[in-house]
């Protein structure tokens, strides 16, 4: 039987602003999200016994319940007519890294299941199902540059598209608490969301300089709280900003992965080599983001 394969690219929050905390405890955000060329790979073998296997450089970092197993179980219980099967995950991205690794994997799994389902998949509300798995899963299901608001459920296209950025992704591979993201949001102490709040529309960028200017203004509201939880973030940002030709450096999501933007793919590759030599225990990957 034919197998189905999907790439699960790293999700990068080019900007992340927290609008406030809702009465239900969730935080409303606005974030410009794009995707890198680095990522995991999800393969589905339809018809085989339902199972999940994992390989890759970060396979041993996955422990406890896995979002892919949960997705398969939920689909089997709510959409009995859809095919499932054996799933293999090639885990190339660091875990709990702020680049949506688990969410990207879940989004890729839903895409392969949608492809394998044929016409039966047309009856499934994949966006709604993605949201039940996590706030970042809907944008990772789409796996393209989008403007994300609400808790992650509202997605809008970027008018005229997003200029490509030449970047380096860096993760210090520090010990990260299992409740990292919850700790970061607790430490943020965001104000209560105003009753009249309405998310702004998706931004428009005339060129790459306009995009970088927008990123510098918006930044990442989680960065100070995230660095308090994982202090190594400070060292990563310092290493990035010390590099020749660096144009911008920031934290993605709740971290600890950071990214630096460079004027060309060649400059990004040189930065990757320099960082890998200076910090051999870090995960470093040059990648276009778009």
Regions found by a protein language model. Give the residues of each.
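ATP-binding N-lobe of GHMP and related small-molecule kinases
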Residues: 1-97, 115-124, 171, 177
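Short, basic/glycine-rich phosphate-binding loops at helix/coil junctions
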Residues: 48-61, 109, 131, 210-219, ...
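Phosphate-handling active-site elements
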Residues: 77-88, 111-133, 264-277
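DPxDG-like acidic metal-binding loop motif
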Residues: 97-123, 139-141
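Glycine-rich beta-strand-to-loop/alpha-helix junction loops that act as flexible
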Residues: 101-102, 251-256
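Conserved, helical-rich catalytic subdomain that frames metal- and/or nucleotide-binding sites
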Residues: 142, 147-248, 263-266, 273-276, ...
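Short hydrophobic/aromatic beta-strand micro-patches
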Residues: 259-261
């Amino acid at each position: 039987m034919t197998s189905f394969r999907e790439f699960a690219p790293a999700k990068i929050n080019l900007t992340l602003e927290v609008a406030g905390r809702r009465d239900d405890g969730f935080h409303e955000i606005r974030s410009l999200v794009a995707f890198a060329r680095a990522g995991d790979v999800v393969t589905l073998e339809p018809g085989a016994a339902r199972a999940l296997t994992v390989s890759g450089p970060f396979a041993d970092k996955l422990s406890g319940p896995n979002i892919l197993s949960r997705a398969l179980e939920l689909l089997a219980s709510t959409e009995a007519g859809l095919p499932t099967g054996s799933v293999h995950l090639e885990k190339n991205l660091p875990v709990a890294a702020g680049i949506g690794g688990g969410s990207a994997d879940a989004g890729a799994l839903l895409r392969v299941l949608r492809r394998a389902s044929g016409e039966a998949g047309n009856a499934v509300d994949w966006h709604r199902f993605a949201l039940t798995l996590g706030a970042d899963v809907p944008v990772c299901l789409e796996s393209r540059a989008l403007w994300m608001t609400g808790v992650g459920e509202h997605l809008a296209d970027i008018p005229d598209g997003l200029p490509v950025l030449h970047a380096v992704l860096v993760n210090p591979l520090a010990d990260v608490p299992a409740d990292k993201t919850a700790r970061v949001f607790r430490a943020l102490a965001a104000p209560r969301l105003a009753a009249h709040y309405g998310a702004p529309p998706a931004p428009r960028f005339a060129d790459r300089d306009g995009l970088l200017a927008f990123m510098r203004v918006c930044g990442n509201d989680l960065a100070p709280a995230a660095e308090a939880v994982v202090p190594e973030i400070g060292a990563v940002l310092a290493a990035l900003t010390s590099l020749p030709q660096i144009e911008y450096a920031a934290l993605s999501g709740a971290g600890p992965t950071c990214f630096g933007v460079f004027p060309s793919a060649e400059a990004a590759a040189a930065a990757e080599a320099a960082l890998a030599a200076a910090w051999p225990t870090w995960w470093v990957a040059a990648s276009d983001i778009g």
